[in-house]
Amino acid sequence: MAAIAIPENTRVFLLDIEGTTTPITFVKDILFPYIRENLEDYLSAHWEEDECKQDVHLLKKQTEEDLRQNKACHVHTVDQTVHTDEEKAIREVVENVLWQMAADRKTTALKQLQGHMWRAAYMMGRIKGEVYQDVVPAIRRWRHHGLKIYIYSSGSVEAQKLLFGYSVQGDILDLFDGHFDTNIGAKVESKSYENIAERIGCQPEEIMFLTDVTREAKAAEDAGVNVAVVVRPGNMELTEEERDHYRIITSFNQLELIGNV
C-alpha cells in the first residue's frame, strides 16, 4: 500500500496491541492455551502463597455474585474454605476458570489469576511477547522526531508491560511514554479518548490512533482523534465503506511524518 502522511499537528501515537502491534493470534493461540495447559500445576505450586489465596478468594466471591445474579444458570462453584482436601479444592478452581474462559468472560477475578500466571511464564522465559517486525523501527523513528508513544489496550496495564518487557525483541518498554487500559474507559466509547488526551495533556486532534477495530476507530474519530486502521493477517475483514472512509495501513512504515520533523 502507498505511504500515508499523518496530520502535521500530530504529537502522540496511541497504539492498540492485538491485531496492531501484535498478531491477533497471540492471545488466542499462545496466552489462553498456556492458562488451560498449566493451570492445575500452577495452583498446586502456589496454593499456600498469599497471592494465590487472594486469587482464589476473588474467584469464590465472583461465584457467589454469579449465583445471586442468576441462580438458574449453571455456575462452577469455588469454595476452598470448606475443603481440607487440597486436590479437590484445586480441581474446583480449575473447573471454574476453564468454564469462565470457555464463556469468554472478562471478570476481574479471572483476569487477575491469568495475569499472575502470565507474569510467572514471562519471567521464566516460557512465553515471549510477539511484536510485528515493522513496529519497533517505526516507533524509534517517531520518537526520534519528538513524538510520544502510548499504548491503549483492553488488556491490563500489567499485561501490556509484560508483553513488551519480555518480547521477542527484548525489553522494549522504554519505547513507550505510558499505558492505558479500560480503567480509562471502554475502547468503543468516544469519552475514553477525550480522557486519554486530557491525561496526556494534549488535544484529541493531536493524537493518531492505530487500531484494527473499526468500532474503536469510530469512537476515537468522534472524539476528534485522527485514526488509521491497521490490516494484518487474521484481522477482521473491512467493508468497502470502511476502506473508503479510513486511512488503511498494513505496516507502520507506511506512515510518513511529513511536516512533523
Swiss-Prot record:
Its cofactor is Mg(2+). The keyword Hydrolase applies. Mg(2+) binds at residues 16, 18, 212. NCBIfam families: enolase-ppase, HAD-SF-IA-v1. InterPro entries: Enolase-ppase_E1 (IPR023943), ENOPH1_eukaryotes (IPR027511), HAD-like_sf (IPR036412), HAD-SF_hydro_IA (IPR006439), HAD_sf (IPR023214). Its EC number is 3.1.3.77. Belongs to the HAD-like hydrolase superfamily. MasA/MtnC family. It is an enzyme of class 3 (hydrolase). This is Enolase-phosphatase E1. It comes from Danio rerio (Zebrafish). It holds the Pfam family Hydrolase. It is found in: Cytoplasm; Nucleus. Gene3D superfamilies: 1.10.720.60, HAD superfamily/HAD-like. Keywords: Amino-acid biosynthesis, Cytoplasm, Hydrolase, Magnesium, Metal-binding, Methionine biosynthesis, Nucleus. GO terms for molecular function: acireductone synthase activity; magnesium ion binding. Bifunctional enzyme that catalyzes the enolization of 2,3-diketo-5-methylthiopentyl-1-phosphate (DK-MTP-1-P) into the intermediate 2-hydroxy-3-keto-5-methylthiopentenyl-1-phosphate (HK-MTPenyl-1-P), which is then dephosphorylated to form the acireductone 1,2-dihydroxy-3-keto-5-methylthiopentene (DHK-MTPene). It catalyses: 5-methylsulfanyl-2,3-dioxopentyl phosphate + H2O = 1,2-dihydroxy-5-(methylsulfanyl)pent-1-en-3-one + phosphate. GO terms for cellular component: cytoplasm; nucleus. Binds 1 Mg(2+) ion per subunit. Pathway: Amino-acid biosynthesis; L-methionine biosynthesis via salvage pathway; L-methionine from S-methyl-5-thio-alpha-D-ribose 1-phosphate: step 3/6; Amino-acid biosynthesis; L-methionine biosynthesis via salvage pathway; L-methionine from S-methyl-5-thio-alpha-D-ribose 1-phosphate: step 4/6. Monomer.
